[in-house]
């Protein structure tokens, strides 16, 4: 296969991965964890996946500790945990 063909295949696989919804069975287990502010006293606006509402929601992170259900953007939360897009910017 030519290098152009490989690049096309890679582009198609990347697009497919972005557009394929994540089911609850494919979702990382940390997506089901409750948000944890951690042990530090910062006040950082972060996003977590809420499995009860199937949405990425805001919480405030202290800056250290916590768990992996902690994202800087809604986009990253959606990509990782599969919440539907709400039509708002990240």
UniProtKB/Swiss-Prot annotation:
Residue span(s) of domain BPTI/Kunitz inhibitor: 31-81
Gene3D superfamilies: Pancreatic trypsin inhibitor Kunitz domain (4.10.410.10)
Keyword match Manganese: no
Tissue specificity field: Expressed by the venom gland.
N-terminal signal peptide: 1-24
Location of the protein in the cell: Secreted
GO cellular component: extracellular region
Primary localization: secreted
SMART domains in the cross-refs: KU (SM00131)
Disulfide bonds: 31-81, 40-64, 56-77
Propeptide span(s): 85-90
Molecular function in Gene Ontology: serine-type endopeptidase inhibitor activity
Keyword annotations of the record: Cleavage on pair of basic residues, Disulfide bond, Protease inhibitor, Secreted, Serine protease inhibitor, Signal
Residues under site feature: Reactive bond for trypsin: 41-42
Family, as annotated: Belongs to the venom Kunitz-type family.
Function: Serine protease inhibitor that inhibits trypsin.
Name assigned to this protein: Kunitz-type serine protease inhibitor C5
Native source species: Daboia siamensis
